[in-house]
Amino acid sequence: LYLLVGTFALGAVGLAQAAGFNLSPQCPPSFERTDVGVCRLRSMYQTYTRIEGHGGVQMALPPARDGFTPQQIDLGRHLFFDPLLSGDRKSSCAHCHHPDHGLADGRATGAGFGAEGFGPERRGGVALPRRTPTLWNVAYATRLFWDGRATTLEEQASGPLFSPQEMGNSAERLTQDLNANTSYRQLFAQAFARSEDKAITLNEVTGALAAFESTLISLNSRYDRYAHGDRKAMSAREVQGMNVFRGFVARCTQCHTPPLFTNHELAVVGAPPPAKGQPIDEGAGAITHDPLLRGAFKVPTLRNITKTGPRYFNAGQLGSLDEVVAFYNAARGHALPKGEKQALHWHVHMMKPKLSDDDAKAIVAFLGALEDETMSPQPPAAVPSGLPVVPVRAAPH
């Protein structure tokens, strides 16, 4: 069952502007409004001080990107769901980072500019070479995109907006469209505490998107409740998988380090080509020209990994989490084409750990305990452009 929201039509001379918008003065759940009016995340993890080690529970979190006002966050939410941000006015950020699909799209690789629809059913348009990354916990990210080319949420936001292959817009047209919209001029003035007479800037646009994305936090899974002391939160099978996951043989936590289940580093794991007969994706090596980073990709978070399938790896080469575990259980470089040379990661877990079938399946069971979508964003009822808002599943009551 889907909830359709924001069904406004195009006018004869342009977009019909929707009226009556106001930004929420409240911080999102799990955020607290401070005395200076900004929202700060509050989590049990902030009470922990241990930062060393890879497999332990009750580990401290790294610094997060927060400190935005409620109005800036809510403005970012409206922008995130507004197709006005794309060059053809067909796709919003949410069409590819959809709440129903783990803030990704459920496709093997993304469908870019000109595509229709959302999620796994998105069709047509530019065929993108990589999977759409999830946005869960990007507030903690120090590298963004599969190749790690962005270091801030603002930089990440501007990448797809102005890529001809993705959203196909330009900075000039985007700011022109926003400034021509009375409602957006009012909302930006609210969010940034300034006069409506001042023109909307690109920095304000990417800043608002960063504010919203900083609230996409997933830290309340059954694993988290177990880590905080509730030993009944996970099943015996999941606890077995956790112990294999963090144990000496598998050492998954060397890269997928709790509590974020990523270390945000670039890793060369010998990923197979995107498809049989195709050349490998050089990853970070293509932009750094460093031979040691040929085939390197950012270590993805495993939070909500069960929600972002069914395809995995940088180009959806693997079709299940069982296949992913089997990949790491095999010999180093086994999936690389003959003659392909890569500086493979040296960790012990890349040396064919020889996990039993039972232990491998237990790891997959444990990954299900990392599900938490309690802070999944809800779309606005309408957006200032008047364009249709992408449908989302009706929230269960």
Segments the model singles out, each with a brief description of its role:
Residues 2, 14-397:
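Periplasmic c-type cytochrome electron-transfer domains
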Residues 7-12:
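Core hydrophobic alpha-helical transmembrane segments of single-pass membrane proteins
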